[in-house]
C-alpha cells in the first residue's frame, strides 16, 4: 500500500493544473456549446429554424466570432465533435477561432446514457471504449479539456447505491484516461431537477453523490489539481410547491460542496439545469457573496443559460446576428460578475432571460 506507481509525471501534472487554472481564472467560466445534433433540433424548433449542419455552424459561428473581449468572461468553450471540425464564416477552423481569443477549447467525449437493469430507471454513461484513442486525437486537434456527463435522479428509491457507485466509477475512469492524454477532465455528476423533492433532499443526495465521486477519483489516482467539477446547484425539484430564495439555494449548495469537494480542486463550474438565464446568474452570485469559506472558484458552465436570449434574438436570420451576439455577450458579462459576487440586477431582465429552460429528463 505504501508504494505508488506514479500515474502522471511532474510535467504532465503541471500542464493539467495550468489548463484548469486558465479556464477558471477570476471572472471566467465556461460556455457549454456541446449540444448534440438532436438537442440542437429542440432548440431550433422553438425559433422555427431547420436543424441543418449549416444552421448549427452558423449559430455557433455567431457565438465564437463575438468581440475578443469575451475572453474576460469566458475561459473555456465545450464543443461537440461535429463543431470541432467546422469553420467560421471566414474559413477558419472553430478551435483556432476560439484559441486566438485566448480561450481554452474543450470537447464532449461521452456517448450518452444507458439503462441500469434492476433499478428504477437509473442510468450509467457509455463511451469508455476507445476513449484513450479519441482523447489523443482531440488533443492533437487543439482540445485541452474534456467533459463527460453522468445523470442521477431523486425519487423514493433514487439515487440508489448501485446508481451512485457505477456513475462515480465511470467518471473516475474517464478522468484518469483524459489526464493520461493531456486533457483536463470536467467531472459532471448531474442530479436532475425533475421531481417534487425539497431543498434538503437535494442537498442530501448531492452530498452522497459527490462523496462517492471523490472517493472514486482517489481510488483511480486522479490528479485533482488537474480537474474541474461540473455539478448541479442544490435546488428543489421542479414540481416542489415551496420556492426557495437564491440565498437558500446558495447556502445549501456551498454547504454540500464544503462537505465533499477537496480544496485541491481548482474550480467548480455549475451547470444551469434548466434554470432561467437570470435565475442561474442570481444563484451563482449569491454563492459568491456568502461569508462561508470557499477554497475553490465557484463559476459557471452554462449552455441554455448563456444562449437562450441569443437564440431568441437570432431566429436563424443573418440580419439579427449583431443583436444575437449582443444578447450573448450581455449574459456572459453578467455571469462573469456573478462568479465574483458582483452582479447587481437592474430589475430590467428581458423576457427571454427569465423564462424557465426546464426540459423533463433532459438529455444532451
From Swiss-Prot:
One of its GO terms (molecular function) is fructose-1-phosphate aldolase activity. Signal peptide: none annotated. It comes from Danio rerio (Zebrafish). Substrate binds at residues 56, 147. The keyword Cytoplasm applies. GO terms for biological process: fructose 1,6-bisphosphate metabolic process; glycolytic process. Keywords: Cytoplasm, Cytoskeleton, Glycolysis, Lyase, Schiff base. It catalyses: beta-D-fructose 1,6-bisphosphate = D-glyceraldehyde 3-phosphate + dihydroxyacetone phosphate. This is Fructose-bisphosphate aldolase B. SUPFAM superfamilies: Aldolase. Its EC number is 4.1.2.13.
Amino acid at each position: 500500500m505504501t508504494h505508488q506507481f506514479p500515474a502522471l509525471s511532474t510535467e504532465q501534472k503541471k500542464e493539467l493544473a495550468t489548463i484548469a487554472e486558465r479556464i477558471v481564472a477570476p471572472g471566467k467560466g465556461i460556455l457549454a456549446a456541446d449540444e448534440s445534433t438532436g438537442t440542437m433540433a429542440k432548440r431550433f424548433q422553438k425559433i422555427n429554424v431547420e436543424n441543418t449542419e449549416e444552421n448549427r455552424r452558423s449559430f455557433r459561428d455567431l457565438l465564437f466570432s463575438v468581440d475578443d473581449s469575451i475572453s474576460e468572461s469566458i475561459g473555456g468553450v465545450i464543443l461537440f465533435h461535429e463543431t470541432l471540425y467546422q469553420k467560421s464564416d471566414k474559413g477558419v477552423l472553430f478551435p483556432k477561432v476560439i484559441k486566438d481569443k485566448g480561450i481554452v477549447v474543450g470537447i464532449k467525449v461521452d456517448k450518452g446514457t444507458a439503462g441500469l437493469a434492476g433499478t428504477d430507471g437509473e442510468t450509467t454513461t457509455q463511451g469508455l471504449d476507445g476513449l484513450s484513442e479519441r482523447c489523443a486525437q482531440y488533443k492533437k486537434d487543439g482540445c485541452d479539456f474534456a467533459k463527460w456527463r453522468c445523470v442521477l435522479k431523486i425519487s423514493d428509491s433514487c439515487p440508489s447505491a448501485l446508481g451512485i457507485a457505477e456513475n462515480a466509477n465511470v467518471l473516475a475512469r474517464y478522468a484518469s484516461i483524459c489526464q493520461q492524454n493531456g486533457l483536463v477532465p470536467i467531472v459532471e455528476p448531474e442530479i436532475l431537477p425533475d421531481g417534487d423533492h425539497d431543498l434538503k433532499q437535494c442537498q442530501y443526495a448531492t452530498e452522497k453523490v459527490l462523496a462517492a465521486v471523490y472517493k472514486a477519483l482517489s481510488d483511480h489516482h486522479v490528479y485533482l489539481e488537474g480537474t474541474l467539477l461540473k455539478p448541479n446547484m442544490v435546488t428543489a425539484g421542479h414540481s416542489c410547491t415551496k420556492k426557495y430564495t437564491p440565498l437558500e439555494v446558495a447556502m445549501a449548495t456551498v454547504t454540500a460542496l464544503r462537505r465533499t469537494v477537496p480544496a485541491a480542486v481548482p474550480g467548480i463550474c455549475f451547470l444551469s439545469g434548466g434554470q432561467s438565464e437570470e435565475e442561474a446568474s442570481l444563484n451563482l452570485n449569491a454563492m459568491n457573496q456568502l461569508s462561508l469559506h470557499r477554497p475553490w472558484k465557484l463559476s459557471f458552465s452554462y449552455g441554455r443559460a448563456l444562449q437562450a436570449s441569443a437564440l431568441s434574438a437570432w431566429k436563424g436570420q443573418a440580419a439579427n446576428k449583431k443583436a444575437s451576439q449582443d444578447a450573448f455577450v450581455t449574459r456572459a458579462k453578467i455571469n462573469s460578475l456573478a462568479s465574483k459576487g458582483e452582479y447587481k440586477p437592474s430589475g430590467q431582465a428581458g423576457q427571454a432571460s427569465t423564462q424557465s429552460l426546464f426540459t423533463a429528463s433532459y438529455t444532451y
